[in-house]
């Protein structure tokens, strides 16, 4: 019996998907049987993949699995002090965590997560940029990013996958055009990459130039290496040392579609650009690694891992139900 979970992936309140994991070599096939559970041992049921709203910390929304953890910012933190922190950002934060142990509830309960007490820490600097991944809409060569998310809901947690959805309220990009984003994020057990599906609601135009980007400038995280590759879908990786004694962070964004032109650098971030139509979703991936808690100890090793993941995205499994 392998870890598995039943999930409501479309949010209608009814279970519609069976999720499970297995490893495959290229060109191989495997058979799986769905049997009556009365004669089987129970599969592990721990919520390895977990996401939740964090109202006790100014409306953060956080998610994690056994390898990585992230958070994004809600409306409360955007309020001026003392009610909030005045942080307006739709970028993604990275938490450096040691593999295996969940940290979200522990970090927030402790409150002191900017120092490593043995489980990891938050040393990444997001600021108003895209962080480890985010959207901006370009007009006249300038990026226009949303504010903090306006609403958020966890969809499901479990041993195989967690998923949630956030909505970014309409923002002006100029020329009488307003854009809103609905973002659905899923993270699998054993993966350092979250899968993101963004759907833009556009008013005042039929299409816009959407940029999927991440932080790459020197100002926030002291990046040592940044790579960009648009072959077979856009890929960018970065390797940084935000603090002198806490190791290095690798971040990456993968887009499984052909970007328009080369990567665009603007305001400390790098973007892959595509045309986006009203109501038509597009997918992208964001990931991160901490060298003190992974086999990836260099920028080259992290870039190679990101390229491997891109190959997996480009060549998905084919499933047949008999």
What kind of region is each of these model predictions?
Residues 1-51, 87:
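Alpha-mannosidase-like glycoside hydrolase catalytic domains involved in N-glycan trimming
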Residues 181-183, 187, 192-227:
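Acidic (Asp/Glu-rich), glycine- and aromatic
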Residues 33, 51-53, 74, 87-88, ...:
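Sequence-level preference for short, compositionally simple segments enriched
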Residues 1-17, 172-176, 220-237, 254-259:
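Solvent-exposed beta-strand/loop surfaces of large extracellular or lumenal domains
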Residues 13-24, 251-322:
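Beta-strand-rich recognition/accessory modules
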């Amino acid at each position: 019996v392998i870890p598995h979970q039943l999930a409501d992936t479309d949010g209608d309140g009814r279970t519609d998907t069976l999720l499970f994991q297995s490893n495959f070599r290229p060109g191989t096939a495997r058979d799986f049987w769905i049997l009556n559970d009365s004669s089987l041992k129970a599969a592990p049921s721990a919520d390895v993949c977990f996401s939740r709203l964090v109202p006790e910390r100014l409306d953060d929304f956080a998610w994690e699995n056994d390898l990585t953890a992230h958070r994004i910012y809600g409306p409360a933190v955007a309020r001026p002090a003392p009610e909030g922190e005045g942080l307006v950002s739709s970028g993604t934060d990275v938490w450096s965590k040691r593999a295996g142990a969940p940290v979200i509830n522990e970090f927030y309960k402790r409150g002191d997560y900017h120092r490593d007490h043995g489980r990891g820490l938050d040393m990444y600097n997001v600021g108003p940029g895209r962080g480890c991944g985010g959207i901006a809409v370009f007009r006249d060569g300038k990026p226009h990013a949303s504010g903090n998310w306006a609403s958020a809901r966890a969809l499901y947690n479990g041993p195989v996958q967690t998923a949630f959805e956030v909505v970014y309220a309409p923002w002006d990009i100029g020329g009488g055009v307003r854009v809103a984003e609905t973002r659905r994020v899923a993270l699998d057990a054993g993966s350092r990459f979250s899968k993101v599906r963004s759907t833009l609601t556009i008013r005042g135009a039929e299409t816009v130039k959407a940029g999927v980007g991440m932080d790459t400038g020197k100002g926030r995280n002291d990046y040592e290496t940044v790579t960009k590759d648009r072959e077979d879908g856009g890929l960018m990786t970065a390797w940084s040392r935000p603090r002198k004694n806490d190791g290095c962070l690798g971040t990456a964004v993968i887009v499984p579609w052909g970007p328009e032109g080369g990567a665009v650098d603007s305001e400390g971030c790098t973007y892959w650009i595509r045309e986006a139509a009203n109501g038509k979703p597009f997918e992208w991936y964001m990931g991160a690694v901490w060298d003190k808690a992974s086999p990836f100890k260099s920028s080259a090793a992290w870039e190679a891992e990101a390229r491997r993941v891109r190959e997996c995205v480009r060549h998905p499994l084919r499933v047949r139900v008999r």
